[in-house]
Amino acid sequence: MKHRIYILVLMTTGVLLAMACSKGGSSSGNNDGPHPIPSPVDTMAPALTVNTPSSNQVFTSGNVINITGRITDDLGLYRGSIRITNDANGTLLKEQLYEIHYVLAYDFNISYTTYVTTASDYTVTVFFEDHGYNSATKSLKVKVNP
């Protein structure tokens, strides 16, 4: 009897763990798709630092925008995204999605080479969340000149 209970507990734990680590949904933070079962003990939001670029930094066409920083969480991260959007028309210029289950600290680094014929304003948005639905978002503006 003990053996059967042990197997049942292991199977239940495995199913719950698989559900908690599902890859469903998007990293937009809109909860527009399936999301893992939230962790009721995870109440602290991740800490997000964006090192580069700086807010309102000016680039010239052909320059590379490097987006670097660090995300940490006390109980582990779930997923995130980094996006560069053209403010004039809403075009998504670059998107990097992350699934980094239960990682406590992650250094991110992506690059985007700019090409413009007229001065353009871009928004850089960095978003990450943990398994408790807690999230951290930072957005900043940059300008690209021809």
PLM regions and their residue ranges:
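Extracellular acidic, Ser/Thr/Pro-rich low-complexity tracts
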Residues: 57-58, 67-75, 86, 130
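Short, solvent-exposed loop/turn segments at the edges of extracellular beta-sandwich modules
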Residues: 25, 128-134
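C-terminal motif of bacterial Sec signal peptides marking the signal peptidase cleavage site
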Residues: 17-20
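Hydrophobic/tyrosine-rich beta-strand signature of extracellular beta-sandwich/beta-rich modules
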Residues: 124-126
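C-terminal edge beta-strand
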Residues: 36, 138-144
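Proline/serine/threonine-rich low-complexity linkers at boundaries of modular beta-sandwich domains
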Residues: 28-49
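Aromatic sugar-binding surface patches on proteins
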Residues: 100-111
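Surface-exposed, short loops/turns at beta-strand junctions within beta-sandwich domains
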Residues: 114-121
